[in-house]
Amino acid sequence: MAIKRVAIVGLGLIGSSIARAIDERLPQVAVTGHDASDDVRGVARDLGLCDGIVDDPVAAVADADLVILAVPVGRMADAAAAIAPGLKAGAIISDVGSSKAGVADALAKALPDHIIIPAHPVAGTENSGPAAGFASLFDGRWCIVTPGAGVSGDAVAAVTGFWQALGAKVETMDAAHHDMVLAVTSHLPHLIAYTIVGTASELEEVTESEVIKYSAGGFRDFTRIAASDPVMWRDVFLANKDAVLATLQRFNEDLTALQQAIRRGDGAKLEEWFTRTRAIRRSIIEQGQDDAAPDFGRKH
């Protein structure tokens, strides 16, 4: 099937980046945008995002071949219900949420299973809002597609081709497996970052000014992650709680083992652990998933 018109519901970082990428790389595709926030719609209009920004979600999806819900995962069910009356026959519904099994269930409450193709572009920054988006956000990044059993191959191919056209590498995956993988690679790191920064800010022995003044590179990396949209991440943790809790349990066990090694003065254990985990970093660089520049390419 050909995608000639796309509707984007939600014009934050991801939604606005999709709009910009379509404009740059798929200029023949018409784009209509909608956001529940009056302020966001106003900014989107000022920025010239999409071919049109509309106030009504039903009007936004009219005649769209592909509808992308770029809203926090906790709002997926409401967003699906809002657009359902305006969908044309044959339209595909997708999303960009960081959890997939729960999103699929939420969408299915308002929409037929056979038109839902959940997707997760594994890309982003700590910034949010329509002004934060940029067309190259998805370049070389993975987009994981988790179609249900009843979806046609043509529809899956259309969504796959769409994301590839925006610069992404596409992988098809079972929704539950996606949620476990992302709990390890994305959700738990964000939870740890929020915790470390929160702990540092509450230590009575260290003032906030000292935390800011003497922050080393590692701590600054955590603060960058902790600057991410709190509403979005609140919803992600709640939507993917089973996988997050399972991963957090394993992390706590490993952390306890390291705590015991430090207490015992077991340098061999610490070095073995650090050496093994260092290899993961090298593999990420080798696969082009990050910058090999010294100090993560940080400018001083």
Specify the residue positions occupied by each region the protein language model found.
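Interdomain hinge/lid region at the active-site interface
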Residues: E208-R276
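Internal alpha-helical scaffold of NAD(P)-dependent oxidoreductase catalytic cores
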Residues: L137-R224
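NAD(P)+-binding Rossmann beta1-loop-alpha1 motif at the extreme N-terminus of oxidoreductases
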Residues: M1-D56, V61-A62
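Phosphate-coordination loops involved in phosphoryl transfer and adenosine-cofactor binding
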Residues: I3-R5, G90, G140
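Rossmann-like NAD(P)(H) cofactor-binding subdomain of soluble oxidoreductases
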Residues: A79-A131
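Glycine-rich, N-terminal phosphate-binding loop of Rossmann-like dinucleotide-binding domains
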Residues: A70-P72, G97, P147
